[in-house]
């Protein structure tokens, strides 16, 4: 199981929620993050344990990997 840090941001780039999850893959972390995002979420950032950016998504777009 891999560890992913998920950060939910609003339009002003303020952190709405931040969580650490254990998932089998980045795809599973993306699905989980999308499901748990609130209506106020503008951007979702996913990074690994050492805060290396792995993927991000804006509310109106698709996932993009860094």
Regions found by a protein language model. Give the residues of each.
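Generic detection of short hydrophobic beta-strand segments and adjacent strand-loop junctions
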Residues: 19-21, 57
């Amino acid at each position: 199981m891999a560890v992913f840090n998920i950060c939910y941001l609003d339009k002003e780039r303020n952190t709405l929620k931040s969580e650490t999850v254990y998932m089998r893959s980045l795809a599973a972390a993306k699905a989980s993050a999308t499901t748990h995002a609130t209506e106020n979420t503008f951007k979702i950032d996913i990074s690994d344990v050492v805060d290396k950016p792995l993927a991000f998504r804006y509310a109106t777009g698709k996932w993009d990997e860094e």
